[in-house]
Design a protein with these regions (language model features):
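Amphipathic, heptad-repeat alpha-helical segments
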Residues: 2-34, 70-135
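Glycoside hydrolase catalytic-domain groove-lining segments
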Residues: 225-256, 319-345, 352-356, 368-443, ...
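Conserved, mostly hydrophobic/aromatic
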Residues: 134, 215, 248, 291, ...
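Aromatic-rich peripheral "rim/lid" segments of glycoside hydrolase catalytic domains that contact
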Residues: 273, 294, 303, 308-328, ...
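An acidic-aromatic substrate-binding cleft motif
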Residues: 172-223
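Active-site beta-loop-alpha junctions enriched in small/polar residues
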Residues: 192-196, 220, 260-262, 304-307, ...
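Substrate-binding cleft and catalytic face of glycoside hydrolase catalytic domains
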Residues: 210, 214-231, 239-350, 428
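Short, acidic/polar
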Residues: 195-209, 281-292, 364-379, 401-402, ...
Length: 517
């Protein structure tokens, strides 16, 4: 049955001063729960157009829009929280994109303020100044709705103050919670420990243990960073990992091993990629028991699966098969050592890949799940995990979007870890000279072009929000040292020589301000 209806058009009005680009050439839609779904949405300078939502009645549109003096960033239009519906088949409805973005942000800020007030927080004069400016400009934009150009200009200004207000609301509320709560001595501030092999080990331990109380050790079957863990099936190379494990233990660092199953393109050997589903089940059972058993109770947690919400899927399994593999691995890990936590790690928090229909570089063969839908499927199928994990590399979203997404994990009733977070410190002479990270000609993404202090700002603000939430137990920065970081120039150290970036010092001062150091 056809689900095609009429055209809903979001017409952009380019009031920006600069050359752009001002609107990304693709967009996506989300349902009322903010889960991305596949639709026929398209985006161009002529407009964002959608006419087939595959039966989803109410939806938002997610566009990357250049909001000068804030950033070229993804922003939601959700009709002020009421969401959109398609016009009847054969019909057409046109909306002013600028106005819809502004309206949606104004109404969100109202909801967030009221929500936070119930906990005793009172917004400051500074916060309310931004809120009032955005509200007044929104009222002006409403009065000029018949004049699209004028309405768009006022809406853009409204959105600017509204976005700044959103971030200030969340940060101020977080600081309020921190000020009234007890020091969280059990809060984990962590990082991956691969730096042990990327720089002088003694220097690594000096700088790492001064900063972190939590570390992850990776067990990729094949890896470009250091010795492969399982290049040949069954030939497990523990020795390299055991060295750093033992050193971290000597320094009283809590350790997580990761991952037991991650079928991503760069770490999946052909012998695994070519296994049938039944063969994978047998392998997962044996592998999990052997790896978890090797460390006994020495690990705090094992990451059971990574990015398995139909994103990392070189083994090309169905959603049901992935759920079953996850369940089996959790059962075996618990049976092997019930005292060790079982963590599920998710990437791509906003699930743009659902619209792009991609498993990494592969075209997706089956319907895909967002991280939240994947986690709900695990709960519904009785999968016995104990920690919910979400990566949060700078997501081309503002801080308000980040915390609202993370709040969705509360319903699963497990502690939440921000398993991998990171942002760039921007290009430097070395990255420009070797071409690994050059100066961009596009509008900046967030506040200004990335530099060391902006990286430190984002780190400080994200960690502040996370620390204020009792249900978030850890934040893990990825990675420690450049040029080996996943995010280009995303390390806390400039090079293996150990030069500290502003973000390294900022994180240390932040912990001191909380009484953790």
């Amino acid at each position: 049955m056809s689900t095609q209806k009429g055209d809903l058009i979001f017409k952009p009005y380019f009031v920006q001063r600069g050359m752009g680009p001002n609107l990304l050439n693709w967009a996506y839609a989300c349902d009322e729960n903010w889960d991305a779904f596949y639709s026929n949405i398209s985006s161009s300078n002529d407009g964002v157009v959608i006419s087939d939502t595959a039966g989803v009645e109410k939806f938002s549109v997610e566009v990357r829009w250049n909001l000068e003096d804030f950033g070229y960033i993804f922003i939601s239009a959700d009709n002020g929280g009421e969401f959109y519906e398609l016009p009847p088949a054969g019909g057409k409805k046109e909306l002013n994109l600028n106005f819809e973005l502004a309206k949606s942000r104004v109404f969100r800020n109202r909801r967030r303020i009221e929500k936070h007030k119930t906990g005793g927080w009172i917004p400051s004069y500074e916060v309310m100044s931004f809120v009032h400016l955005s509200e007044e400009l929104f009222s002006d934009a409403e009065r000029f709705k018949s004049n699209n150009d004028k309405c768009a200009e006022l809406s853009q200004k409204c959105l600017l103050y509204g976005m700044h207000a959103s971030e200030k609301i969340e940060l101020e509320k977080a600081k309020y919670e921190i000020s009234k709560n007890k020091i969280r001595k059990d809060f984990f501030i962590g990082c991956d420990a691969r730096g042990f092999y990327q720089m002088d080990p003694e220097l690594f331990l000096e700088l790492f243990t001064k900063q972190f109380n939590y570390a992850t050790i990776t067990y990729y079957q094949i890896s470009g960073n250091y010795r492969d863990f399982e290049p040949t099936e069954g030939d497990l190379q523990f020795a390299t990992r055991d060295v750093v494990y033992n050193e971290l233990k000597k320094n009283n660092i809590t350790i997580e091993g990761r991952p037991l199953y991650w079928p991503y393109k760069t770490v999946t050997p052909d012998w695994m990629r070519n296994k049938s589903y039944d063969q994978l089940l047998k392998y997962i059972e044996k592998h999990t028991r052997e790896v978890v058993g090797h460390y006994g109770e020495g690990m705090y947690a094992w990451e059971i699966v990574n990015e398995s919400h139909d994103w990392a899927n070189e083994t090309q399994l169905t959603p049901e098969q992935i759920t079953n593999i996850t369940k089996l691995a959790c059962e075996v890990a618990k049976d092997t050592n019930p005292k060790v936590h079982r963590l599920i790690n998710n990437c791509c928090p906003y699930a743009e890949y659902v619209q792009l229909k991609k498993w990494g570089d592969l075209d997706a063969k089956y319907p895909q799940r967002t991280p939240i839908k994947f986690m709900q499927d695990l709960v519904d199928n009785g999968v016995d995990f104990t920690i919910s994990g979400q990566q949060m590399y700078f997501p081309y979203r503002d801080l308000s979007d980040i915390i609202i997404h993370l709040e969705r994990f509360e319903k699963f009733g497990r502690p939440v870890q921000l398993t991998e977070v990171g942002a760039s410190s921007g290009p430097n002479k070395t990255s420009i000279d070797n071409g690994s990270l050059e100066i961009s000609n596009e509008p900046y993404i967030w506040r200004r072009n990335w530099d060391q202090e902006l990286q430190a700002d984002w780190l400080e603000e994200l960690y502040t929000i996370a620390y204020s939430k009792s249900w978030i137990e850890a934040v893990n920065w990825y990675d420690f040292v450049d040029p080996y970081s996943w995010i280009k120039n995303g390390g806390l150290l400039e090079s293996p020589k150990g030069e500290k970036k502003a973000s390294y010092d900022r994180l240390l001062k932040l912990q001191q301000s909380w009484g953790l150091k």
